[in-house]
A protein has these predicted regions:
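N-terminal Rossmann-like or analogous alpha/beta NTP/dinucleotide-binding catalytic cores
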Residues: 1-104
C-alpha cells in the first residue's frame, strides 16, 4: 500500500464540533490502515480576533478523548507567517503571483 500523509487543520475559533471530529476520524482511519502513513495536526490560528487558547486546548483534548493521535508536534500556523511572507515575496519577484488590488 502507498504511504499516505494526511493532515487535520482545525481553526481554534470554537470548540471541537461533530463535523471537525468526523474529518479527524476519517483521516485517522486512513492513517491506521497503513503503518507507513502519517497524520499531521496543524492549528489554523490566523484569525487573531476569534482564535483562543481555550478552543485550541478543547480541540486537542477532544481528539485525545476520541483516541486520535498524530505524528508530529502540532504546527501552529501563525508561527510560520514569516516563512509564508518570504515565499509570497519570492513568487511576486519571479512574476509567478500578483498582488490583488481589489478593495475587499
Amino acid at each position: 500500500m502507498t504511504k499516505m500523509i494526511t493532515r487535520f487543520a482545525p481553526s481554534p475559533t470554537g470548540n471541537l464540533h461533530i463535523g471537525s471530529a468526523r474529518t479527524a476520524l476519517i483521516n485517522y482511519i486512513c492513517k491506521s490502515k497503513n503503518n507507513d502513513s502519517k497524520l499531521y495536526l496543524r492549528i489554523e490560528d490566523t484569525d487573531k480576533d476569534r482564535s483562543k487558547e481555550e478552543f485550541k486546548n478543547n480541540i486537542l483534548s477532544g481528539l485525545k478523548w476520541l483516541g486520535i493521535d498524530w505524528d508530529n508536534e502540532p504546527q501552529i500556523q501563525s508561527h510560520n507567517i514569516n516563512r509564508h511572507l518570504e515565499i509570497a515575496n519570492k513568487l511576486l519577484d519571479n512574476g509567478n503571483a500578483f498582488k490583488c488590488v481589489c478593495s475587499e
